[in-house]
Amino acid sequence: HNGSGRFYMSRIDKCKIIDLPKIHDPRGNLTFIEGTKHIPFDIKRVYFLYDVPGGAERGGHAHKDLHQIIIAIAGSFDVVINDGSDTQRFHLNRSYFGLYVCPMIWRELDNFSSGSVCLVLASDYFSEADYIRDFPQFDSLQKS
């Protein structure tokens, strides 16, 4: 969003897997994330999805301004991202890999394994006004 009411078109190639720091220890491994150091934004909100029923899908929206990191803390799931032109599917199954999703990217999460936990780090507090929940509306914004 550029402040003038027009949105910058986001490209799918800005979204990427970030290899998070790992400390290997025989007592158990540790991964940590520091905002603006390991990821390209400050963390203002953290939430997680769990007990997702088999066959269920999450997501199905885009954000106008929000940046996110999506991590499979336990188990696995797929994230399908779409910029209005291209689609890419990421299979997340390692707790030290985070998928960076920039603003104006449609995302859908599916293929959740039993017991999976999805952790999301967000660049801002919740705001319903930041959501685009209608794909045709998203598509027309991307093409305008």
Sequence positions of predicted segments:
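Well-ordered alpha/beta subsegment
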Residues: 94-99, 104-111
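Non-catalytic, conserved peripheral segments adjacent to functional cores
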Residues: 5-97, 114-115, 120, 126-137, ...
